[in-house]
């Protein structure tokens, strides 16, 4: 039950943060708010996992806050809208920014946490 409460509190915080960031205006038809929440969320998720944080931190931050903060469904919907509008160049750019940006964020979090934990 304790984990459920941590996830619920974290999820509410993450959803509110995402709501605020989603107000950012698109840049060249790219939904910047969605890309930012996914890249930032993936990076922070990696930091918590790679640092082997205690279970309560994992449930509160990764499952709760970052689960409520990141949004694959909005990314998918926005990308589909670009497809419907036959804006294929923007669609591919949006996919690339979200996926590659998120993967780079995880990689950088791995490098950062490894350097911190090894003192190097």
Curated annotation (Swiss-Prot):
<feature type="transmembrane region" description="Helical">
    <location>
        <begin position="57"/>
        <end position="77"/>
    </location>
</feature>
<keyword id="KW-0479">Metal-binding</keyword>
<feature type="transmembrane region" description="Helical">
    <location>
        <begin position="97"/>
        <end position="117"/>
    </location>
</feature>
<keyword id="KW-0472">Membrane</keyword>
<keyword id="KW-1003">Cell membrane</keyword>
<protein>
    <recommendedName>
        <fullName>Fluoride-specific ion channel FluC 2</fullName>
    </recommendedName>
</protein>
<comment type="function">
    <text>Fluoride-specific ion channel. Important for reducing fluoride concentration in the cell, thus reducing its toxicity.</text>
</comment>
<dbReference type="GO" id="GO:0062054">
    <property type="term" value="F:fluoride channel activity"/>
</dbReference>
<comment type="similarity">
    <text>Belongs to the fluoride channel Fluc/FEX (TC 1.A.43) family.</text>
</comment>
<keyword id="KW-0813">Transport</keyword>
<dbReference type="Pfam" id="PF02537">
    <property type="entry name" value="CRCB"/>
</dbReference>
<dbReference type="InterPro" id="IPR003691">
    <property type="entry name" value="FluC"/>
</dbReference>
<dbReference type="GO" id="GO:0005886">
    <property type="term" value="C:plasma membrane"/>
</dbReference>
<dbReference type="GO" id="GO:0140114">
    <property type="term" value="P:cellular detoxification of fluoride"/>
</dbReference>
<keyword id="KW-0812">Transmembrane</keyword>
<feature type="transmembrane region" description="Helical">
    <location>
        <begin position="30"/>
        <end position="50"/>
    </location>
</feature>
<feature type="binding site">
    <location>
        <position position="67"/>
    </location>
    <ligand>
        <name>Na(+)</name>
    </ligand>
</feature>
<keyword id="KW-0407">Ion channel</keyword>
<keyword id="KW-0406">Ion transport</keyword>
<feature type="binding site">
    <location>
        <position position="70"/>
    </location>
    <ligand>
        <name>Na(+)</name>
    </ligand>
</feature>
<dbReference type="GO" id="GO:0046872">
    <property type="term" value="F:metal ion binding"/>
</dbReference>
<keyword id="KW-0915">Sodium</keyword>
<keyword id="KW-1133">Transmembrane helix</keyword>
């Amino acid at each position: 039950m304790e984990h459920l409460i941590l996830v619920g509190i974290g999820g509410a915080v993450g959803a509110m943060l995402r709501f605020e960031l989603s107000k950012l205006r698109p840049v060249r038809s790219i939904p910047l708010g969605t890309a930012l929440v996914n890249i930032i969320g993936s990076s922070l998720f990696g930091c918590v996992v790679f640092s082997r944080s205690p279970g309560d931190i994992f449930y509160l931050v990764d499952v709760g806050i970052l689960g409520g903060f990141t949004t694959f469904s909005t990314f998918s919907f926005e990308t589909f809208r670009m497809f419907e509008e036959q804006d294929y160049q923007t669609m591919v750019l949006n996919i690339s920014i979200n996926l590659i940006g998120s993967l780079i964020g995880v990689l950088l979090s791995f490098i950062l946490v490894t350097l911190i934990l090894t003192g190097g």
